[in-house]
């Protein structure tokens, strides 16, 4: 049984005060979650404060991005070593906003994957197609290319620590979300692809999340699909009650989530 995973991506939101309040509320609301693993990914500037609040909690700390180099003349960047030192256990990589707004390439994302793994953290590789690519029938082609490039050169041991997230670009921050059936179709394809790229064993154990306008009212319908192992939550993760509800509903297929 793959334990559902729920990740809150706070994006570029949160003053120190807001971040502390949100982290404390999430911690208090998920003291003893059963049947679900929960991660929050705040902005870099509030990682220390949030990490302090989550110390010893059932909710893990993650980051939204990193650089692939250990250190150097990379103005404005943050290395995986720095994130590990702050207590991060997870890092989002290849998010659609990084790919499309900041023009990150598959090669750069692959280098970041290696850096995150070297520092003992777990990477979440995001893949997904744009609205135009979907209209042209290229969904499978796009996500296959992103997966193969992102995982290139990684050992079986490394791949066992990786998580995938399918995030259709047309459903991110738009209020339009893929139906459970649409999401399940791509997740099923990705799981089959993992079997081809890596192994049948990994295909059975790798967790594949869905991200794209996830809210409390659609999380359970999504995670009830057999190949959807949790959700990557954007805007809805900024409201503690809704995020807590999403986490508990996502745990439904593994049994009730208790506080």
Model region roles, listed by residue range:
Residues 1-259:
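Active-site loop-to-helix "anion-binding N-cap" substructures in soluble metabolic enzymes
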């Amino acid at each position: 049984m793959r334990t559902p995973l729920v990740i809150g991506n706070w994006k570029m939101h949160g003053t120190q005060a807001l971040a502390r309040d949100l982290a404390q509320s999430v911690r208090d609301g998920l003291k003893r979650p059963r049947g679900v693993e929960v991660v929050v990914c705040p902005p870099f500037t509030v990682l220390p404060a949030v990490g302090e609040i989550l110390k010893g909690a059932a909710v893990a700390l993650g980051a939204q991005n990193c650089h692939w180099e250990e250190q150097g003349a990379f103005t404005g960047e943050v290395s995986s070593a720095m994130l590990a030192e702050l207590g991060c256990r997870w890092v989002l990589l290849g998010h659609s906003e990084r790919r499309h707004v900041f023009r990150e390439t598959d090669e750069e994302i692959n280098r970041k994957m290696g850096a995150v793994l070297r520092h003992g953290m777990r990477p979440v590789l995001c893949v997904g197609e744009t609205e135009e690519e979907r209209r042209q029938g290229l969904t499978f082609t796009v996500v296959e290319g992103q997966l193969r490039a992102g995982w290139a050169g990684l050992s079986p041991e490394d791949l066992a620590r990786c998580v995938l997230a399918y995030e259709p670009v047309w459903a991110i921050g738009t209020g339009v979300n893929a139906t459970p059936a649409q999401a399940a179709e791509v997740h099923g394809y990705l799981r089959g692809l993992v079997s081809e790229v890596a192994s049948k064993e990994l295909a059975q154990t790798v967790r594949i999340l869905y991200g794209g306008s996830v809210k409390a009212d659609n999380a359970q319908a999504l995670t009830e699909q057999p190949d959807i192992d949790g959700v990557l939550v954007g805007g809805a993760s900024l409201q503690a009650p809704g995020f807590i509800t999403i986490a508990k509903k996502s745990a439904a297929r593994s049994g009730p989530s208790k506080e």
